Every structure is written in C-alpha cells, then in structure tokens.
Amino acid sequence: MRGREVPLVLLALVLCLAPRGWAAPVTAGRGGALAKMYTRGNHWAVGHLMGKKSVAESPQLHEEESLKEQLREYAQWEEATRNLLSLLQAKGARGHQMPPWEPLSIHQPAWDSEDVSNFKDTGPQHEGRNPQLN
C-alpha cells in the first residue's frame, strides 16, 4: 500500500510547485533580457501595420463616389419635393381631391412592366371563393 502512495505524493508536490499559467516559466537570470527585448509583448506587428492603406484606394476615387452619392440623394429629395408641391397645389385648387402622383424612381420595379407573357390569368378560378372581395 505504501508503494502506491509515494508516486501520488510526488506528483502532488510537483504540481504544487509548478507555476500556474499558460506561459512557459523563464529563469531568473534571463528574465531581464527578455523583458528588454519584448517590452510590449508579442504585438510588434500591430503598430507596424497601423495606418497602412491599400494602393488601389485613392482619395480622388473616394471623392468622386461621394459626389455621385450626394447627387443621387439631391435628385431624390428634389423629386420628393416636386411630388409634395403638386399634392399641396392640387389640394388647394380642387379641395380634397388627390392628384395623380408620380412614384419615386427608386421604387420602380426591376422587371419590364410591358412584358406580361409569364403571367397567368387566374381570375375565374377564384371567383366563387371569396364573394365579398369581387
């Protein structure tokens, strides 16, 4: 029985004396040299790569895209303002009748509205199902 306990006691003693943590222990004599070499740890590449930009990116290209986006937004606001103005003018001229308004160009469908060859006429099939909607 005594032969089994000795290895367990030695294992417990080694584990208690072992340093806790993920890093390998450094001897006392070399600790100062390593501390001077790697003062900021292992993150030397972080500072080295900060502020680097791609060569393909140019400020002029970014400015042109920004101007195009501003022009698109301005055109949308102008179109919305025209629609609102026509609504207000029609309301004042005709009382409460709503004028025909133009939808904003950004909400137009992506398909060709003239091409209806792919649509099937399903009207007669649904006549008897829901009479209050007919």
Curated annotation (Swiss-Prot):
InterPro entries listed in its UniProt record: Bombesin
Annotated function: Stimulates the release of gastrin and other gastrointestinal hormones. Contributes to the perception of prurient stimuli and to the transmission of itch signals in the spinal cord that promote scratching behavior. Contributes primarily to nonhistaminergic itch sensation. In one study, shown to act in the amygdala as part of an inhibitory network which inhibits memory specifically related to learned fear.
UniProt-annotated stretches for the region Disordered: 95-134
Protein name: Gastrin-releasing peptide
Signal peptide boundaries: 1-23
Propiece residue ranges: 54-134
Bilayer-spanning residue ranges: none
Native species: Bos taurus
Residues found modified as Methionine amide: M50
Swiss-Prot/TrEMBL keywords: Amidation, Cell projection, Cleavage on pair of basic residues, Cytoplasmic vesicle, Mast cell degranulation, Secreted, Signal
Gene (name only): GRP
